[in-house]
Amino acid sequence: MTDNRATGWKIPLLFCGVILSIVAVAALFRAHAPEPPAVPQALLKEAKGIRIDLESDPEGQSWKARIASAASGFSTQADKDGRLGEIVLTTAENKRFDASCTAAVLIREDGLRDGLMRKIANAASADCASLPWGVFAMHGMRDPQAQAEASALLTQRWKECHEGRE
């Protein structure tokens, strides 16, 4: 006599167990993104209070339309990144940091994105009132070294701006 019990469930169950084990181990060893460098708490608080609203004024609406146009279409990602980069440079030069940061976060090429975020942080550090935009840009960078450099610049400028006020 033969044993006719259903035993075909063991192999799929073992396979699922092995896959779950591999996923669990990989999750434990996966590199976590490092925390951005520290900036003064008051500056960080101001940066966290930033709300980007390009719809609030006609100029912002115009920039929003340009950004949407540059980021869409049937062109290569490099072309889109290039058009967005031009918008970032123009808006940072015009102190329109809300549009600069909006366009910069849409850039996919890390080196270009970090370089443009650095330019936003540099432009924002020129004026004490716009320093929170520099922190916003610093948090958008992906390179820890670039973040550290931007953090040092912003912290130094914050101290210069608030010397004697504390």
Task: Locate each region found by the language model.
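Non-catalytic tandem-repeat scaffold regions and their flanking low-complexity/translocation tails
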Residues: 14-166
